[in-house]
């Protein structure tokens, strides 16, 4: 706060209060059932929908924070989209990761349960995909297909379209795939964001 202009809200509050409120924010979100990582002491970096790295002091549990702007996500990455889904730009992501030295391969996940959505592009949105994935056995089917696509990749990159109602699904997919699995935010609406909003609404 000391290096900010005198009229900046952080300067007006003072360093100690800003630190106190930041710590309280973390506790509050966790008490609401929202999984987060990060510290007010330093920023981490997360991958944006366009593949850029953005500094952030808190990161939702779906996403994998990076320690630096230039950190490689892995040696070889399998970038997996949902067939027909246009709000997850795999080419942008691959270009960005390859600049950091990660070899990328792009594939598409094809599930017959998505056929109805795919017939109408306006329906092929993150929240609608997530609702389908939440049905019994669908995310498990997706995870098995992803695992079967792996060759020698050490990292899988997926759109964050899983676990609209149950954030445990995200961790279960990571376990099922069996290698480092990163979920990257899609263009809005954001499934993790909507889930967090629902958790907050449930508290008030």
Say what each PLM segment does:
Residues 110-141:
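Short, intrinsically disordered low-complexity segments
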Residues 88-100, 130-156, 161-204:
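Helical element adjacent to the flavin cofactor pocket in flavoenzyme catalytic cores
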Residues 1-76, 81-88, 98-99, 103-116, ...:
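Conserved N-terminal/central alpha/beta ligand/cofactor-binding core
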